[in-house]
């Protein structure tokens, strides 16, 4: 989105900074209390039995800690960690090369697992159930199937689009776990920890200001923290205060709800061009010059969570809160009757 500040998009941080700011254990991990409590039980049980932990699926919006939790699982299980992604595994041989090199009880993390090709997914089924690979050698009448035994391992899948997973693949995960947006209090702790690790002095009000505008997402909180620290060093005395945080984030185009220029463009489009909706997702994506997936995965989850938009069978509609946020008056037409009376 051309008018959107990339600071607010939950793409990954540079690897060195990303790794430095990540918690290294479940004890350090802030938020996702229910998921952490359950994972602690499953990890301890696997360690006591000396077996591979059951296959685990993390799903939810991007930037909530799916990769971090997978790394923590491997660390607390005391086993190796291998990481890949669905689009990278283009053919069965790619998957076979990884699986045959796993040590006993290792954790294999597949990001964007909903993007696995069907042919690779078919090879994965026996690997998950029987720890074996069934590969076809040769072609035509001379083709034969060879079974390769694998070491027991734990597959951790991550997806932002649970609905795109096939039912057979989804059913093979014994531990499905949904990650939720973080509270402001949780993000404040995360930002304060990040500031300490960066060697930056901070005021509670300053870290809270960043947390308030981080869209419930730790990855965005970390990115905003780095930008605010830049302003604190160049235009302040190096201390992260509420005033410098507010000034920096305002200049970055982040409002008090955490919406950026792209979010406000989305809301304004529906308000000004379509009278508040309903309007179809394909129309919205075309008008914004964005891919439909980008709109559904990146922009809409937080707007829905904040109660700014509503998904209906006829399309997207603005909620009353969105009209107030835009400083506009909601129309009283029949299309809005169900939302505004």
UniProtKB/Swiss-Prot annotation:
Q: Which residues cross the membrane?
A: none
Coiled-coil spans in chain: none
Q: Binding positions for ATP?
A: 21-22, 63, 66-68, 129-131, 172, 182, 219
Q: Which reaction does it catalyse?
A: ATP + H2O = ADP + phosphate + H(+)
Gene Ontology molecular function: ATP binding; ATP hydrolysis activity; four-way junction DNA binding; four-way junction helicase activity
Could you name the Gene Ontology cellular component terms for this entry? cytoplasm; Holliday junction resolvase complex
Which parts of the sequence bind DNA?
Answer: 292, 311, 316
Stated EC number for the protein is 3.6.4.-
Positions of the region Small ATPAse domain (RuvB-S)?
183-253
Residue ranges for the region (Head domain (RuvB-H)) are: 256-341
- Subcellular compartments: Cytoplasm
Binding residue positions for Mg(2+)? 67
Q: Which UniProt keywords apply?
A: ATP-binding, Cytoplasm, DNA damage, DNA recombination, DNA repair, DNA-binding, Hydrolase, Nucleotide-binding
Among CDD domains, the record links this protein to: AAA (cd00009)
Extract one GO BP annotation from the record: DNA recombination
Q: Does the keyword Electron transport apply?
A: no
The record's principal subcellular location, in a coarse class, is cytoplasm
What is said about the domains? Has 3 domains, the large (RuvB-L) and small ATPase (RuvB-S) domains and the C-terminal head (RuvB-H) domain. The head domain binds DNA, while the ATPase domains jointly bind ATP, ADP or are empty depending on the state of the subunit in the translocation cycle. During a single DNA translocation step the structure of each domain remains the same, but their relative positions change.
> Belongs to which family?
Belongs to the RuvB family.
What is the role of this chain?
The RuvA-RuvB-RuvC complex processes Holliday junction (HJ) DNA during genetic recombination and DNA repair, while the RuvA-RuvB complex plays an important role in the rescue of blocked DNA replication forks via replication fork reversal (RFR). RuvA specifically binds to HJ cruciform DNA, conferring on it an open structure. The RuvB hexamer acts as an ATP-dependent pump, pulling dsDNA into and through the RuvAB complex. RuvB forms 2 homohexamers on either side of HJ DNA bound by 1 or 2 RuvA tetramers; 4 subunits per hexamer contact DNA at a time.
- Give the multimer and partner information: Homohexamer. Forms an RuvA(8)-RuvB(12)-Holliday junction (HJ) complex. HJ DNA is sandwiched between 2 RuvA tetramers; dsDNA enters through RuvA and exits via RuvB. An RuvB hexamer assembles on each DNA strand where it exits the tetramer. Each RuvB hexamer is contacted by two RuvA subunits (via domain III) on 2 adjacent RuvB subunits; this complex drives branch migration. In the full resolvosome a probable DNA-RuvA(4)-RuvB(12)-RuvC(2) complex forms which resolves the HJ.
Under what name is this protein listed? Holliday junction branch migration complex subunit RuvB
Q: Which gene encodes it?
A: ruvB
């Amino acid at each position: 989105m051309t008018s959107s500040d990339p600071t607010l998009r939950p793409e990954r941080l540079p690897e060195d900074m990303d790794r430095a700011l990540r918690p290294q254990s479940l004890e350090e991990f802030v938020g996702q209390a229910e998921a952490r409590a359950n994972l602690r039980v499953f990890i301890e049980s696997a360690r006591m039995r000396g077996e591979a932990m059951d296959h685990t699926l993390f799903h939810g919006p991007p930037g909530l800690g799916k990769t971090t939790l997978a790394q923590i699982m491997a660390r607390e299980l005391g086993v190796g960690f291998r990481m890949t992604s669905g689009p990278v595994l283009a053919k069965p041989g790619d998957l076979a090369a990884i699986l045959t090199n796993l040590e006993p009880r290792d954790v294999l993390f597949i990001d964007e697992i909903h993007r696995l090709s069907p042919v690779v997914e078919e090879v994965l089924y026996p690997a998950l159930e029987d720890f074996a690979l069934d590969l076809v050698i040769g072609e035509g009448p001379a083709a034969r199937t060879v079974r390769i035994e694998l070491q027991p391992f734990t597959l951790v899948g991550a997806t932002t689009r649970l609905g795109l997973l096939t039912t057979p693949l989804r059913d093979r995960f014994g531990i499905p776990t949904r990650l939720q947006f973080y509270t402001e209090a949780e993000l404040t702790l995360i930002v304060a920890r990040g500031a300490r690790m960066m060697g930056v002095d901070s005021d509670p009000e300053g870290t809270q200001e960043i947390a308030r505008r981080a869209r419930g997402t730790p990855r965005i909180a970390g990115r905003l923290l780095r930008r605010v620290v830049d302003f604190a060093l160049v235009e302040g005395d190096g201390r992260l205060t509420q005033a410098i945080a507010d000034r920096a984030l305002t200049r970055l185009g982040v409002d008090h709800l955490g919406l950026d220029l792209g979010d406000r463009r989305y809301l304004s489009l529906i308000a000004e061009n379509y009278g508040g909706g309903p309007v179809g997702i394909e129309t919205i994506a075309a008008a914004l010059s964005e891919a439909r997936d980008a709109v559904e995965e990146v922009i809409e989850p937080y707007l829905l969570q904040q109660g700014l938009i509503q998904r209906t069978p006829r399309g997207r509609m603005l909620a009353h809160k969105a009209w107030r946020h835009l400083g506009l008056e909601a129309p009283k037409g029949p299309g809005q009757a169900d939302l505004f009376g």
